[in-house]
Amino acid sequence: MLATKAKAYWQLTRMNRPIGTLLLLWPTLWSLIIAAKGMPDFDVLVVFILGVVLMRSAGCVINDFADRKVDGHVKRTKQRPLPSGLVSSKEAIVLFLVLAVVSFLLVLTMNPLTIKLSFIGVGLAFIYPFMKRFTHLPQLFLGLAFSWAIPMAWAAQTNELPSIVWFIFVINALWTIAYDTQYAMVDRDDDLKIGIKSTAILFGRFDKLMVGALQLVTLAMLIALGMHYQLGDTFYWALLVSGSLFVYQQHLMRHRDRDLCFQAFLNNNYVGMAVTVGLFITFW
């Protein structure tokens, strides 16, 4: 019984599926590397790596709580712990609060500016899952939530927030909207039946075009970022890899096959990794 419950909690926090953690981690590392112009302070690095894991898990818990009444009607999610009855709603809320509190305790070791920013981060993580009931742009709110670690990390490293931070914030928000639209394309048919909204539904037959446009703007802004910091060739080679991966994702999406759209979404891990490696080598 205990083992079953532990496994259910593990699944509820998506510890068994680290893709979301990685997609949140890469831009956080971009911010830390650029702010530190190389290797960030060790304590800041540890706090943000742990914070990414904990807050992504908290986000998954509150997302499943928000979707508990509809997940049972979606092919991909009907076996999740809440709709299957392995975890109660009360247990999910308690778990979310525990993860959020532990994350906040970590943030308390940082400077006051970072602590203040963390309240907005928790708010974004909490409201995002409910947006899909009210707007076709929940991916925008995910973009904001997944990008908020960027100003937090920069503030923790430097105790300031120059305008370039918000430029990086927008880069990641656009990239997040692109890959979460790919993710939404997987569930589009089910979402239409149960009244859940998404950019995949909003974009309709222009979904692939819009994802491509978002990817193109993301790349263009990354190039502008490199020019701003006068980064070396390694960074641009990394962007060439990222651009090639975007082209590959478009190939996967061409027939809007559910499984292949999901593969396109997963492929974004390598995009984030390429940019991170490029930045690290360049600044190192």
Swiss-Prot record:
Disulfide bonds: none annotated. InterPro entries: HB_polyprenyltransferase-like (IPR006370), Prenyltransferase (IPR039653), UbiA_prenyltransferase (IPR000537), UbiA_sf (IPR044878). One of its GO terms (molecular function) is 4-hydroxybenzoate polyprenyltransferase activity. Pathway: Cofactor biosynthesis; ubiquinone biosynthesis. Keywords: Cell inner membrane, Cell membrane, Magnesium, Membrane, Transferase, Transmembrane, Transmembrane helix, Ubiquinone biosynthesis. It is a multi-pass membrane protein. It catalyses: all-trans-octaprenyl diphosphate + 4-hydroxybenzoate = 4-hydroxy-3-(all-trans-octaprenyl)benzoate + diphosphate. Belongs to the UbiA prenyltransferase family. NCBIfam families: ubiA_proteo. Catalyzes the prenylation of para-hydroxybenzoate (PHB) with an all-trans polyprenyl group. Mediates the second step in the final reaction sequence of ubiquinone-8 (UQ-8) biosynthesis, which is the condensation of the polyisoprenoid side chain with PHB, generating the first membrane-bound Q intermediate 3-octaprenyl-4-hydroxybenzoate. This is 4-hydroxybenzoate octaprenyltransferase.
